[in-house]
A protein has these predicted regions:
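A structural signal for multi-pass alpha-helical bundles of membrane permease subunits
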Residues: 1-205
Length: 205
């Protein structure tokens, strides 16, 4: 790909920005007197309190996490795709396979281990999310604690010296993370295991 190094750098740049800086930037932009609401007012629309609405606060948190980690996930997947032997693609095209068929039958199965890795790490990162909602909502999880995460609850119990509850939350969080990670990993790599088992049986015969 032409200029692939440049595009990789541009895509990865948001990942280098600290979560605290990202949160403060979004807090300023989407505040009641921020540039987004000023633009809405100039268009004759009422002020939308992003941080006071459940959909607004959750949407901003989701958008920030997407922007911060999109680059990292893209680079990992691109590395997996670029590592595929081009000879396999050329052979498939010669056999008359379409681009969609090549992607579905060749590219996707080959990068499944990488997809499993990205899904599991994204899942763990989502469960352990703390810095963005903590800073954006000033640690309160507003509105009405709908933006509270498990780690924010854990942090509150630690600061209130309720160490028993904090320890219990840590264990529960670990179990949930482990179970979900194993489920996602096995679900994504299921076809690979089945294919490998069938191949080994044929080889023995």
């Amino acid at each position: 790909l032409k200029c692939s190094g440049f595009f990789k750098t541009v895509i990865y740049l948001p990942n280098l920005i600290m979560a605290s800086a990202f949160s403060m930037l979004f807090y300023t932009i989407f505040s009641d007197v921020g540039p987004i609401n000023n633009l809405l007012n100039s268009m004759g629309l009422p002020t939308y309190r992003f941080l006071a609405e459940v959909a607004g606060a959750r949407g901003l948190i989701a958008l920030m996490n997407f922007l911060m980690w999109f680059g990292n996930t893209t680079i990992v997947l691109m590395a997996g795709i670029m590592g595929i032997d081009t000879g396999i693609m050329e052979a498939a095209r010669i056999d008359g396979a379409s681009s969609f068929q090549i992607f579905r039958k060749i590219t996707l199965p080959i990068i499944k281990p990488i997809m499993a890795y990205t899904l599991v790490t994204s899942l763990i990162g989502g469960i352990q999310m703390f810095d963005v909602p903590q800073i954006l909502t000033n640690g309160n999880g507003n509105p009405d604690r709908t933006s509270m995460t498990a780690i924010m609850y854990l942090n509150k119990h630690l600061y209130s010296k309720n160490y028993g509850m904090a320890g219990a939350l840590s264990v529960i969080l670990f179990i949930i993370t482990a179970v979900l990670s194993i489920f996602v990993f096995k679900y994504v790599t299921k076809d690979m295991v089945d294919t490998g088992a069938k191949t080994s049986k044929k080889a023995k015969k």
